[in-house]
């Protein structure tokens, strides 16, 4: 199976969050009890991606290096790249060309949070796609503020539009995308939009026009948050808080995913426990390590009952 690398786009000026983001990166803001970037990073980890490129602005890149380091503590490898100015999501593939090399790639936006009972299984399946492009569709009440995809009965994209006045479907496209290696050349050959950006919608259209853009609808039981406004950021924080306090769990616990993926051993988890010992995050890691294996009930969803 072809290797897949990951890119987290953590740039932009986040003017919709001013004055909060006047001096700090949006992706560093807390979503309840963790930095925002933990959530997209955990999604890549669930997909089985171990090599990740973080793209950010010249003034914020060092903060991400300080927060995340080399990835060694998670059994991963992190690289960093500066995006001098925001010129569109598709620019990530051009900036990341050397990093991607001959591999396939997943791009996730640094302000996106996805959650659901089977989300890990879904992301792993998406990451195994060898060719073409694969995106997700999430039902929303008012799709006019999003990229919108229309699909046929087999899950193939048949139309995709950016913030349409008259949407053809109610499926918004979350900010997580899986592509084969051709995405680099596709990104290089698309033309800037009227706002002067290389649009991810045009990348998706290129795959769709080749008949190679598949869509996985995320139905009931899944949550997706784009935390780009104060209200959405607050909603995401409230959601995470409710889940964690009610269930005694942690969403986007990086060491947990690394441990269960067998990328790190107990000694790395113990190191994190010592670092976070005064927090609920650290206490959760202690409980996880004492349990020492993934809860059996997480496998129930793979049984014939749920197929």
Language-model segments: residues:
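A short acidic, often aromatic-flanked loop/helix-cap motif at beta-alpha or helix-coil junctions
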Residues: 81, 85-89, 142-143, 166, ...
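Glycine-rich beta-alpha junction loops
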Residues: 60, 112-114, 139-142, 164, ...
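Long, low-complexity C-terminal extensions of enzymes
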Residues: 252-295
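Basic phosphate/pyrophosphate-binding loop/patch that engages nucleotide-derived ligands
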Residues: 102, 115-156
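Catalytic-core segments of class I nucleotidyltransferases/pyrophosphorylases
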Residues: 106, 127, 156-256, 263, ...
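Hydrophobic packing residues within well-ordered alpha-helices of enzyme cores
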Residues: 17, 64-68, 187, 236, ...
């Amino acid at each position: 199976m072809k290797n897949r690398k990951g890119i987290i786009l953590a740039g932009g000026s986040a003017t919709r969050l001013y004055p909060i983001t006047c001096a700090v990166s949006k992706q560093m803001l807390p979503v309840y009890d963790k930095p925002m970037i933990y959530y997209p990073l955990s999604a890549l980890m669930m997909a089985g991606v171990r090599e990740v490129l973080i793209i950010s602005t010249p003034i914020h890149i060092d903060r991400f290096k300080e927060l995340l380091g080399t990835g060694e503590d998670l059994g991963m490898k992190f690289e960093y790249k500066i995006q001098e100015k925001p010129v569109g999501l598709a620019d990530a593939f051009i900036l990341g060309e050397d990093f991607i090399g001959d591999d396939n790639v997943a791009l996730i936006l640094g302000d996106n949070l996805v959650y659901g009972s089977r989300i890990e299984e879904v992301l792993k399946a998406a990451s195994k796609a060898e060719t073409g492009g694969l995106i997700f569709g999430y039902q929303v009440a008012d799709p006019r503020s999003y990229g919108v995809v229309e699909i046929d009965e087999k899950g193939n994209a048949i139309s995709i539009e950016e913030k349409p006045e008259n949407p053809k479907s109610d499926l918004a496209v979350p900010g997580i995308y899986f592509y084969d290696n051709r995405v680099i050349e596709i990104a290089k050959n698309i033309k800037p939009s009227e706002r002067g950006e290389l649009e991810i919608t045009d990348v998706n259209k290129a795959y769709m026009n080749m008949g190679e853009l598949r869509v996985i609808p995320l139905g009931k039981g899944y949550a997706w948050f784009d935390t780009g406004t104060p209200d959405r950021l607050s909603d995401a924080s409230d959601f995470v808080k409710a889940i964690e306090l009610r269930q005694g769990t942690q969403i986007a616990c990086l060491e947990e995913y690394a441990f269960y993926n067998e990328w790190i051993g107990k000694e790395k988890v113990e190191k994190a426990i010592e670092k976070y010992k005064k927090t609920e995050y650290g206490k959760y890691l202690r409980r996880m390590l004492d349990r020492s294996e993934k809860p059996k009930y997480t496998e129930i969803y793979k049984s014939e009952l749920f197929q």
